[in-house]
Amino acid sequence: MLLSAYLVNSAVRPASKERPFRPKIRGACFLTRRFGEKIILPAVALLALVADQISKYLVLSNLNPGQSWNPVAFLTPWVSITHVTNTGAAFGLFPDQGSLFVIIAVIVVAAIIFYYRHLPAGQWWIKVSLGLQLGGALGNLLDRLRLGYVIDFIDFKIWPVFNMADSAIVIGVAILAYYLLRDRGEKENGEHLMQES
């Protein structure tokens, strides 16, 4: 009786489909994510450095110091490409202090790398900002070591002439300041809510 019931149930019940073998590699996503985070700074820094050096090479190859080029005629009153040699800091500040700024640039590069290595997981935008600052600092440092001065060329008429390395540094600092201030505000709000509760 029991045997016949078992045989009937076995005949009625469809055979279970075998699932394909899919080995689970624990930590694969974690490793990919960690690798992605580790290359943010060098990748962004390299992009900023290459863009800066290519733009300076084009200016150096096509314009004499003091010479200007106006790629867009109707923008001439507001912006142009002007070849300027800068022996000072960003935007032409503190001229003829090249050796001092080489030392400062080396310290800044070391500080960025140290700070980056001690950042917790995540913090993508902060890492991008550090990459921009590192690439910009290296771009201007390369100029000082190779030429003895920095090549500036972006001329907005009402502002000191600057270059793409300066732009990368300023954008990187702005991003970093925004996220640090935002995190500080969120922390203060959290502490305020805890005190109220």
Where are these regions (language model features)?
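Alpha-helical transmembrane bundles and membrane-interface segments of multipass inner-membrane proteins
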Residues: L2-S197
